[in-house]
Structures are given as structure tokens and as C-alpha cells.
A protein has these predicted regions:
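Conserved alpha-helical substructure of the radical SAM core
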Residues: 3-125, 132
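Conserved AdoMet/S-adenosylmethionine-binding subsite of the radical SAM
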Residues: 90-194
Length: 194
């Protein structure tokens, strides 16, 4: 077996492809198949915790300092700062502070931003996400029936709202949509490919 050494850790930090922040464990949906949902027992309880900028600033500063040394072996590496949840758009204040801070740093590498989202709040924040060039991974399990496990906290389907927000994004920002938007689906008994 290969031992992890300080040099191995340093090499991996210098060549980091992605930094992912769990922005919040809170979600505005209650998907039936979620690991926090009704089909599972013995899971961690969601506590509606929100990540604060003050908690991630030291990490960002450390990585920036490290990446700006001459130790990096790549001419212009690309690193994604990714936002995940729960539903990350529920903590948009954190996302904006983090993105604004990173953009002000003089980091010697290409920085991109990405997010996995259920798109329920996309209508509120799409202008900002487009302006910052976010790469979006939108969770959608298919048509209305295929997406029927993805419900809000009252048990109502999220499908209509998500589709409306996705179509609005596609209509208002067609190039962004073509270049920066992908979809993530959970295969299950209502949408699985046979």
C-alpha cells in the first residue's frame, strides 16, 4: 500500500481540481429517496446549519498562498469552487461573499464556480449565476411522473416550478444554458431505463 506523506498532500493541494463547500444541510424539498428522507433510518438529522464565510476564509487564503508559490507544476491549472447542500441557494449570502472574495484575490490559476441545485430558487438568482459564469448541475428525474419523488415539504410536486425556472433560464440566457447547464437524475422505479 502507498503511504500518504506530507509531499503527497502538498502535491494534491497544489493540483486541486475542485474545492466543494457544503453550504447548508437545509433543503427546500423533501425528496422521498433522499438519504435524509422517509425511506432511510439511522441517518444524520438535518439541523438547518449554514456555512459562514468566516469558516472558509482561512482555507481560501491558505490555498491562494500555496497556489501563488512556484511549487505548482502546471502553467495555468483550473480549479472549481463548488457549492453543494442541502440546497445551496438557501445560503446565497455565503455564496456571494465567497465568490466576491475569491474574485478579488490574485490567484495564479483559472477559477471557475459550480453548483448542484434543485432549481426551485433559480428564478431569484439566475442573473447572478449567469453573470459569474457558474456551471450548474440541476437535479431533475425526468417527466412529471419520473420526477414525482421530488416533492416539497408539504408533499407537493416540485416539477412545474423547476421546469418553469429551467425554461426561463434557457430562454433568457440560451448560450449560458447550452454551455453551463447539465442535469443530474436519480434512476428509480418511476423513471428507470429498461
Amino acid at each position: 500500500t502507498k503511504r500518504v506523506t506530507g509531499d503527497t498532500i502538498l502535491y494534491n493541494l497544489l493540483n486541486l481540481k475542485q474545492v466543494t463547500f457544503e453550504v447548508t444541510d437545509e433543503c427546500n424539498l423533501k425528496c422521498k429517496y433522499c438519504g435524509f428522507g422517509e425511506m432511510y433510518t439511522g441517518y444524520d438529522i438535518r439541523e438547518a446549519k449554514y456555512l459562514s464565510f468566516n469558516n472558509v476564509k482561512p482555507l481560501i487564503d491558505y490555498l491562494c498562498e500555496l497556489w501563488n508559490t512556484n511549487l505548482s507544476d502546471s502553467s495555468l491549472p483550473i480549479t472549481f469552487f463548488s457549492f453543494y447542500g442541502g440546497e445551496p441557494l438557501l445560503n446565497m449570502d455565503f455564496i456571494k461573499k465567497t465568490v466576491d472574495y475569491i474574485e478579488k484575490l490574485n490567484i495564479r490559476r483559472k477559477i471557475l464556480f459550480s453548483m448542484t441545485t434543485n432549481a426551485m430558487l433559480l428564478d431569484r438568482y439566475m442573473d447572478y449565476l449567469v453573470e459569474k459564469g457558474f456551471h450548474l448541475l440541476i437535479s431533475l428525474d425526468g417527466d412529471r411522473y419520473g420526477d414525482s419523488y421530488r416533492v416539497d415539504k408539504c408533499g407537493h410536486s416540485s416539477f412545474e416550478r423547476v421546469i418553469r425556472n429551467v425554461k426561463r433560464l434557457q430562454t433568457n440566457f440560451p448560450k449560458f444554458f447550452a454551455d453551463n447547464v447539465n442535469f443530474n437524475s436519480v434512476l428509480h422505479n418511476r423513471n428507470s431505463v429498461q
